[in-house]
Structures are given as structure tokens and as C-alpha cells.
């Protein structure tokens, strides 16, 4: 980009309050990988901290949810609000790389993520987990998290486990592959909208 052009700060804060959850998220895309995460679900906090560290995003998240019922509402709504914040922080997507992909190992597990920030919300998820729950987190919610995220982030996300046995390793590899795919996709590599339509 021309030297006299100052890149805008890509950040956004989004809040969402319902009868089930009360959530505020701040995202800084061009950050240092710092995460201050309090979703109320310890394992989800761990996964989101990993996402921040490996994507380079900074994120502050607080969620007060109806965990006395179960983790479903909190996990789903956290994903929806994060997706909205990222979408808003991407501004008009001028110069965006747009596409990103990564294959990430974690011991015996191997995860793949490919994504498109082109405004088309769709998630394809191929993974199975033997353990139904980890630290209060229902593993069936991994897929639902990414489906919800894709909706509000307006992104096409493909995730798959290629190898693996340990449930924790597989889920962490998925989040890390998503992090590295996002790190690639949000790079500014040009000066125009990356679409023949002229708008994303």
C-alpha cells in the first residue's frame, strides 16, 4: 500500500443480552495474541485463548449465562457475538487476503481448516469425539460453535479432523487450525475489494 496511507484500526465491541446470556466482546484483529476470556465454561475459555495466541487477535470476552441449565446457550451466543465483532472489525474488507487455510497437528490429532471471509455464511464440519463432555463443555457444541460463528462472521468455514483419537487434542487442533487460517485470511495484501462483484 502507499506509504502515506494509514491503515484503520480493525477493532469492534459488540454486546448481546437475552434472557439466557449477557455477553460483551471486544476484538482487535491486528493485536498481539492476548486473550482475556471469561465465558463461564473453562474448556471454551482455553480454546478461545488458544485462538487468540495463534491468530494474533486480541480479545476481551465476558459472558454471564444460564449454566445452571447447561452450556448450550452460552457457547452458542459467545460464538454469535464473536462472529459479529470480527465481521464489524473487518470494515469494508478492502485489501483483504480473504481466504485462509491451515493443517495443524497436536500429537496424534491432525486438523484442517479452510475458510473464506467473502460474506457467504456456511459451515462444513467433519469430526467425531468419543468423550461427550470436557470440563463442563459438551463436545457436540464444537460443531454448533463454528456453525453459529460462521453465521454472524459471514464466513464459509470448512473444518475436519484428518487423524486423531484423543478428544481434547482433536478439539484443540481444530481451534488452532481455525486460528492460523484466520491469521492468513485477515492479512492486508492489496488495495481493492477481493471480489469481482466489487463488494463483500
Curated annotation (Swiss-Prot):
GO aspect biological process, one term: L-histidine biosynthetic process
Keywords annotated in UniProt: Amino-acid biosynthesis, Cytoplasm, Histidine biosynthesis, Lyase
Superkingdom classification of source: Bacteria
Primary localization class, coarse: cytoplasm
Biological pathway: Amino-acid biosynthesis; L-histidine biosynthesis; L-histidine from 5-phospho-alpha-D-ribose 1-diphosphate: step 6/9
Reactions mediated catalytically: D-erythro-1-(imidazol-4-yl)glycerol 3-phosphate = 3-(imidazol-4-yl)-2-oxopropyl phosphate + H2O
EC number: 4.2.1.19
Annotated signal peptide: none
Localization, UniProt: Cytoplasm
Alphabetical list of SUPFAM superfamilies matching this protein: Ribosomal protein S5 domain 2-like
Similarity comment text for this entry: Belongs to the imidazoleglycerol-phosphate dehydratase family.
Name of this protein: Imidazoleglycerol-phosphate dehydratase
